[in-house]
Amino acid sequence: MTTSIYLVKGREKSLRRRHPWVFSRGIDRIEGNKPSMGETVEVYDNKGEWLARGAYSPQSQIRIRVWTFDKKEVINVDFFVKRLKAAQALRDVLAARDGLTGYRLIAAESDGLPGITIDRYQNFLVCQLLSAGAEEQKDALVEALNICYPECSVYERSDVAVRKKEGLKQRTGVLSGEEPPKFVTIEENGIKINVDIVGGHKTGFYLDQRDSRQAAVKYVNGKRVLNCFCYTGGFGLYALKGGASQVVNVDVSQPALDTARLNTEANGLPVENAEFVNADVFKLLREYRERGEFFDVVIMDPPKFAESKSQLVGACRGYKDINMLAMQILNPGGILLTYSCSGLMDNGLFQKIVADAALDAHREVQFIERFGQAADHPLDSAYPEGFYLKGFACYVK
């Protein structure tokens, strides 16, 4: 017997606007068997009108994630094939436009597959299954991937803390095909990047910053550039390609720095114009300030500072401090390219934090360009939560 979920009166409004979440407080009653973790359930308004079909997650505040608003649509292999083909149509356009062999294929709710992200690196599909429903449908998803991409291997990188909120353990490994090699080389905008699928950050690389990396090129010609939290050198590669006189790449991970150097060499870029510094960014910026060392461009792309609302206040403090330090080591007329990937921090709050940092740094700052996540991380019109990456180009007087 199919389980039916009835909502509290008035809580159906968001679903009628096709928002894909139902929170625990929005559920009035459950009819039928008690749903198991990840089970597909039918969602009705308080009067019994069918609204959606979704996955039930008993341990999450997001109790139901909607698979479909079409009553005729069954959640099976064909369903996933249909979603994959729809997503691929957009990526085909982007891949041709930007010369991509690596991109986000599925951006979770924004591509109609809540709790599922899939990145493609050449012939490897790297999945993160972040919800109970995604875990329940894993076999159907992998079968659909094998149908749509028979040339590809499928690898799981569900080693993220958010799975704990769903009552799931972290998991990695081959789901079909071959084990990834040490590096898979992708290309974007004419730049080659070596990606560590098994051990790298996220699924191996920060694909969402592609458009920002390309935008950085116009600010760096002949400039001395500091690339903070450089990981495997993404922004630094674009800076060297854009004619920077020097790029100082900074990260706390020596393996990441080693890969950044490898990427620099692989692109035939002038390694003699690049430095690779293993250091804590906060400490290093203070050292630069104390000894009066200045840069023309500072790129500030830190990791997520806020994983939950309880961490937001501390995150705001961290973002303000690090942007203040960056401004203090910029030459007059310098450029700060600064970003936040914390979804809990909206664009307005981040802009205020940067403005507060300018006051503390005693520098006049003008916002001259805004940035967001790359186009293969689309924002669905019914799902504003899909917007998480924001950034600014700041002219620092």
UniProtKB/Swiss-Prot annotation:
Spell out the subcellular localization from the entry.
Cytoplasm
Query: Which reactions are catalysed by this chain?
Result: cytidine(1962) in 23S rRNA + S-adenosyl-L-methionine = 5-methylcytidine(1962) in 23S rRNA + S-adenosyl-L-homocysteine + H(+)
Q: List, for all copies, the residue spans of the domain called PUA.
A: 2-82
Question: Cellular component terms, GO, for this chain's entry?
Answer: cytoplasm
Report TM segments: none
Q: What class of enzyme is it?
A: transferase
EC identifiers of the protein:
2.1.1.191
Question: What are the protein's UniProt keywords?
Answer: Cytoplasm, Methyltransferase, RNA-binding, rRNA processing, S-adenosyl-L-methionine, Transferase
Pfam families registered for this protein in UniProt: Methyltrans_SAM, PUA_3
S-S pairs: none
Q: What is its main location?
A: cytoplasm
Entries under PROSITE patterns matching the protein:
PUA (PS50890)
Q: What molecular function does GO assign, one term?
A: rRNA (cytosine) methyltransferase activity
Q: Which InterPro entries match?
A: PUA (IPR002478), PUA-like_sf (IPR015947), PUA_sf (IPR036974), RLMI (IPR023542), RlmI-like_PUA (IPR041532), SAM-dep_methyl-trfase (IPR019614), SAM-dependent_MTases_sf (IPR029063)
**Role description:** Specifically methylates the cytosine at position 1962 (m5C1962) of 23S rRNA.
Family, as annotated: Belongs to the methyltransferase superfamily. RlmI family.
Q: What is this protein called?
A: Ribosomal RNA large subunit methyltransferase I
